[in-house]
Amino acid sequence: PYVTSSSTTAGGVSTGLGIGPKYIDKIIGISKAYTTRVGEGPFITELFDDNGKMLAERGNEFGATTGRPRRCGWLDLVALKKAIFTNSVTDLCITKLDVLDEMKKINVCIDYENDLPVYKEFEGWLSSTEGITEYDSLPENAKIYIKYIEDFVKSKASIISTGPSRDQTILR
């Protein structure tokens, strides 16, 4: 239940395209700076408070067909680390960093204890990252957040989006 019948792993790309895995030399894992979920099923970091509403509104997290708000929560680094390992991800792309710009505090899930998330809390940056294209121009707290993600999942964020347009992207 709660899954697709398609293979959503990097190995599924090889099968779907009809090419051998040795011809794939880079695997880019893509994750939002927070977590969302469409439909039913478990979502350990789901937020039911104003933070969840803010993520949905600022991130425009509404279904394209139904218009229903997507379920939003803090970034689950345990799940992301597992996905990166399972897919042999070589580079990480973090999207929607700008959605977190107005958050005073930002949490990430670093473990589970009795089916509950264990969080690490970060200070927000409370300034706009929208449109920034150079990593060094990011607010210091945003860089701390990204560095922690990279260290935890053991993958460099070589692409970071800071807005909805293609040109609002940091390439490292």
Task: List PLM regions with ranges.
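Non-transmembrane, aqueous-exposed alpha-helical and coiled segments at domain scale
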Residues: 1-172
